Design a protein with these regions (language model features):
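Eukaryotic intrinsically disordered, low-complexity regulatory linkers and tails enriched in Ser/Thr/Pro
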Residues: 1-102, 106-170
Length: 170
């Protein structure tokens, strides 16, 4: 059974988690609640992308233009959901996903004491195994992508408003 995924603007983070059923996904929400879904993080991300008729691979390739990396690129699903990957666990077996995704479209804060973590809009802390410098770099890239998406959306709205005004004089 496919669980219903929350709205993009409600998702603060998407984390891989080992459960008795195997790899699962914990979704942290902006209000502090959590949802556990019975699928891998990759499947959850694919489902989030597909409801916007988007491809994970194409979004990651597009983000590589900003990051100049081949892997661990942000997934910009929508202006409300720009997911930045961060390493949160060691794999139990080779091939296990080790990356969580944090939504930089919502307020996130890097916490370095006692260990590196990202604090979400809902106040949850996501422990990160990377260095402070690497985390800051990934968050900055995601914020840059988010700002560009917002700017493109604003330009689109202004163009539509201008066309509407032009038609009113006909």
């Amino acid at each position: 059974m496919r669980e219903e995924l929350p709205e993009d603007s409600e998702i603060a983070a998407v984390l891989p988690e080992y459960t008795e059923r195997g790899d699962s996904t914990r979704i942290l929400l902006r209000d502090g609640r959590e949802i556990l879904i019975d699928c891998t993080t990759k499947t959850a991300l694919r489902r989030l992308a597909e409801r916007h008729c988007k491809s994970l691979g194409l979004m990651r390739a597009w983000a590589a233009n900003y990051t100049h990396r081949r892997s661990a690129n942000p997934v910009a699903i929508d202006c409300d959901l720009v997911l930045v990957p961060v390493k949160t666990r060691e794999p139990r077996v080779p091939g296990d996903n080790t990356l969580a995704q944090v939504n930089v479209a919502l307020a996130v804060r890097l916490v370095t004491e006692p260990h590196c973590a990202i604090e979400t809009a809902g106040g949850q802390r996501v422990p990160v195994l990377w260095s402070r410098k690497m985390i800051q770099s990934h968050i900055a890239e995601g914020c840059h992508i988010h700002a560009d998406l917002l700017q493109a959306q604003q330009r689109s709205v202004l163009r539509r408003l201008a066309r509407k005004d032009d038609r009113s004089f006909l």
